[in-house]
């Protein structure tokens, strides 16, 4: 036993580098032995994590349009509880807890990027559109199941064949947390403390409104004049959760996102006002009656500039598919070979290489697609067979093709570009469904539910490759991770549906209190297409050309385009958090000390995210119950913004100082 415990103290030295010819990677848990993995302990804790983090991620995602990855905080909690319970050989159990629990973030990302658009459009069409829990739950559930089934044939390629070729940033961080199980106590303390600080901070803002959530340059007369005359404005969200998110995203990626945002807010919006100030540009939206010069910067963003970002995101998704074509071909070839192989070949496969069989995947995929077809036919398409068949072909084709794009993005940057790919799906679905005769509010619902299924499938595919890579490094049994991922999907889909209903009834997606930027973008794309007004193809085209140019210049087009349609105040804090990350990891000449400080900061940032998001859900539940303690008159006072800036500075100071203190 002692010998085995010594063996489990660190990853092999070849875990992160490419293997030499003939070299084999041997994971921590030996492929020739059996370890505790799936049992009552791991399953119950996995379910608890899925519920907890689904609620938190749904709130934060709808609030700021960014979903934090739950894998790291869940891994920390799993290590902490197994250590507290003094469980022996808990590594395999912790992987299962993490795998079931991490369904939360991916299901949330899939659901909240599309389905709130149903509520947004319901405001405009209250009689024609009704949104039910069943629609949200079933589209999230079936999309998640499709994502799991479509990804499994690609597992071997991404986690084993390409060993050392992809950085897998999030999987690396999560694996290190799980490996350092003996650090459970010391890691849990800063996470818990930061969770309390971040939670209280965001709770005070959301529940009591002691200071403003955003700081803007409109706080002074000169800033007000700049916004009105030159259409120049600067904004920053001062929340703890978004600051933590920026730290984990890192300075490089956050800077690219923010660059996209600044290009829109400081170049395109003022430029449009300068060039077309006296014009009424309403070719794509007859409801626009004001001249561009008479609009506030926020209105120019909403009606025009955001569409350029939408076009850029869609093109970035297409570029991703083109780059992944060889991966798709090789995985399909491997799957076909196994389908034609002999049954007894399975017995010789090592424990750490066992997947669900291709026959189960094929049958499961067919059953899931049949269920999606029935859901579309009876609920979404109102019994129209042609519309249903066209919809299922689109959903199945796009979900499968984009699976590799999602997995590839996660493997390289740890960020799933699912919203851009879903936007392309919605544009394509809307154009095709209009061509086969489905228009108006019914067409909007159909396109959004189709988008919801695709978005959740792609989000799941991207997130699940992280879990499988963690399992590969540690020596888990893939088939167990794959089988129990379905349970996490069911629990997360149900939780997200409930949270979305509560948030809509409490705040409403059109109130401005929930940014839901992706869902608003989806609604903005679909409505003109389905009403025969036509879409702003010129603006989409400008965005698409920009994405091609960015890709040519080796700049991540998707990150830049995302920044273009996510509000400025939510992108600036990402850079602030990223800058804190850079600062704490570059102060010393000792690389090991810098790495240690970076890990400490990741723990604190995870605490900010989890605490801030969870207390955001509590605050929303209080509002839902009729408790509203916010003084709106104070929040409209400029001093509430000044106070917000002061509180934000203290929070940043704490994050820097606490991250630098590693002993």
Name every feature range the model reports, one short phrase each.
Residues 1-663:
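Alpha-helical multipass membrane-protein architecture
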């Amino acid at each position: 036993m002692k010998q085995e415990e010594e063996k489990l103290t660190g990853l092999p030295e070849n875990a992160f580098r490419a293997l030499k010819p003939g070299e084999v990677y041997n994971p921590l848990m030996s492929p020739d032995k059996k370890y505790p993995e799936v049992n009552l302990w791991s399953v119950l804790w996995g379910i608890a994590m899925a519920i907890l983090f689904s609620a938190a991620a749904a709130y934060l995602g709808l609030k700021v349009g960014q979903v934090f990855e739950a894998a790291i905080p869940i891994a920390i909690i799993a290590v902490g509880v197994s250590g507290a319970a003094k469980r022996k050989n808990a590594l395999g159990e912790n992987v299962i807890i993490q795998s079931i629990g991490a369904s939360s973030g991916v299901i949330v990302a899939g659901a909240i990027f599309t389905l709130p658009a149903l509520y947004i459009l319901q405001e405009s069409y209250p009689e024609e559109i009704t949104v039910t829990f069943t629609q949200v739950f079933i589209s999230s559930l079936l999309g998640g199941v499709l994502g799991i089934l479509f990804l499994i044939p690609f597992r071997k390629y991404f986690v084993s064949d390409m060993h050392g070729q992809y950085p897998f940033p999030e999987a690396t961080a999560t694996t290190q947390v799980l490996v350092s199980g003996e650090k459970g106590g010391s890691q849990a303390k800063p996470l818990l403390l930061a969770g309390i600080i971040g939670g209280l901070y965001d709770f005070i803002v959301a529940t009591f409104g002691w200071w403003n959530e955003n700081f803007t340059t409109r706080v002074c007369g000169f800033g007000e004049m700049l916004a009105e005359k030159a259409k120049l404005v600067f904004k920053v969200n001062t929340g703890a959760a978004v600051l933590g998110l920026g730290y984990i995203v890192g300075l490089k990626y956050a800077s690219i996102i923010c660059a996209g945002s600044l290009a829109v807010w400081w170049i395109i919006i003022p430029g449009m006002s300068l060039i077309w100030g006296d014009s009424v540009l309403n070719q794509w939206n007859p409801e626009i009656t004001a001249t561009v010069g008479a609009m506030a910067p926020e209105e120019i963003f909403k009606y025009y500039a955001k569409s350029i970002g939408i076009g850029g995101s869609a093109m970035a998704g297409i570029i991703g598919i083109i780059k992944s074509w060889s991966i798709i071909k090789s995985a399909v070839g491997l799957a076909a070979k196994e389908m034609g192989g002999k049954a007894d070949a399975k017995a010789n496969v090592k424990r750490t290489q066992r997947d669900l069989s291709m026959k189960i995947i094929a049958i499961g995929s067919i059953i899931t697609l049949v269920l999606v077809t029935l859901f579309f036919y009876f609920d979404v398409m109102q019994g129209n067979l042609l519309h249903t068949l066209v919809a299922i072909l689109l959903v199945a084709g796009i979900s499968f093709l984009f699976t590799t794009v999602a997995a590839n993005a996660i493997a390289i940057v740890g960020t799933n570009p699912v919203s851009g790919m879903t936007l392309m799906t919605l544009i394509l679905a809307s154009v095709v469904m209009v061509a086969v005769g489905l228009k108006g509010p019914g067409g909007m619902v159909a396109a959004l539910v189709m988008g919801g299924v695709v978005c959740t499938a792609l989000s799941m595919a991207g997130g699940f490759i992280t879990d499988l890579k963690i399992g590969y490094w540690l020596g888990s049994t893939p088939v167990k991770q794959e089988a129990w991922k379905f349970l996490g999907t069911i629990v997360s889909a149900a939780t997200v549906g409930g949270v979305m209903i509560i948030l809509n009834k409490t705040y409403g997606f059109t109130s401005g209190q929930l940014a839901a930027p992706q869902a608003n973008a989806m609604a903005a794309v679909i409505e003109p297409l389905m009403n025969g007004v036509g879409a702003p193809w010129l603006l989409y085209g400008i965005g698409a050309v920009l994405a091609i140019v960015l890709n040519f210049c080796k700049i991540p087009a998707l990150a830049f385009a995302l920044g273009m349609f996510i509000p400025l105040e939510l992108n600036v804090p990402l850079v602030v958090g990223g800058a804190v990350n850079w600062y704490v990891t570059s102060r010393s000449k000792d690389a090991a000390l810098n790495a240690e400080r970076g890990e400490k900061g990741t723990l604190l940032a995870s605490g900010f995210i989890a605490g801030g998001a969870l207390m955001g859900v509590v605050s929303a539940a209080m509002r839902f119950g009729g408790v509203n303690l916010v003084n709106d008159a104070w929040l409209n006072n400029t001093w509430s913004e000044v106070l917000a800036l002061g509180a934000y500075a203290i929070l940043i100071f704490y994050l820097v100082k606490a991250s630098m203190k590693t002993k």
